[in-house]
Amino acid sequence: DDRRQVRLLDFGLAKSPDATRESVSMSGELTGTWHYMSPEQTLAKRVEVDHRADIWALGVILYEILTLRRPFDGKNQHQIVYEICFKEPDPLQRRNTKVPRDLVTICHKALEKDPAKRYQSAVEFEQDLQRFLRWEPIQAKPASAWTRASKFVRRHRRESSLVAVALAILASV
């Protein structure tokens, strides 16, 4: 706006926290903006959806701001849902090498597949962003080497399998 304040206007379809049914159309299709749905909001996950789904959507928006691309951008709804549930987004720094490491960590924490690993409130998310802007240490921690390696293997299953077989052959010689 004219005071340089960001205004968030829409996350898609509103849903009452007391609602017992998912947001489903008359034809039985899940409704909403697919690219911003958290894993637990998609058809593939049948778990309780709470405010942490909004943290996910904010993480998607932050990722888009930093890379000018969506983290999950399949060709159709099924592919988008699959990517949201089972694939990791391309590492943010691969898409924009100028993004500081702490901001990458903040964004990836907001995009954790498991809601328990995400920021637990918008206040927590905002506080880490404020710490980043003040050059203070952030609360979010980067993924461990083990976590990064396991995510790499999941993203590159075929190549990882070939390397493992080659190493096994070399070890047996």
Task: Give residue spans per PLM region.
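Conserved protein kinase catalytic/activation segment
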Residues: 1-9
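Activation segment
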Residues: 6-7, 14-18
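C-terminal lobe helix-coil module of Hanks-type protein kinase domains
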Residues: 9-11, 33-154
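Conserved catalytic-core motifs of eukaryotic protein kinase domains, centered on the activation segment
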Residues: 17-22, 48
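Flexible, glycine- and charge-enriched loops at secondary-structure boundaries
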Residues: 27
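Conserved, function-defining core regions and hallmark residues within catalytic/recognition domains
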Residues: 30
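Alpha-helical transmembrane signal-anchor helices
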Residues: 153-173
